[in-house]
């Protein structure tokens, strides 16, 4: 893709990168530390002595674990699991199921046409419900936090290092 951009612009010396490295520069400057970019999508980056290691940022279909979109998708999965009897329903799962039409088919229809931001719109409600003790929401938040810790550890981060 970088070559296509350089060719289209008529430039000889061009480096085209995704936004993860610029996020590291913006967050850390030249300092060492870990950046967790968690919004609609997600990535982690660790900078040590000017060298940057990257993890994630592969987009909604293949990654973005612990992101708002991931939380929303997993909430809908949790609703379907509750309907199937393999997960416990909660106030949040019952409410969202009703809002989307009340049937598993309504969940599937919504998900089939949903963008990452459509899934992510559930994230603030998941956070709020977790803070109020909703078991399903807490499980989703804990799963996301566990992923972020595994990813940070995989990059070599340790407690006490800038985050």
What are these regions (language model features)?
Residues 6-7, 24-34, 76-163:
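ATP-binding/phosphotransfer module of carbohydrate and carboxylate kinases, centering on a glycine-rich
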Residues 1-89:
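Phosphate-binding/catalytic loop of phosphoryl-transfer enzymes
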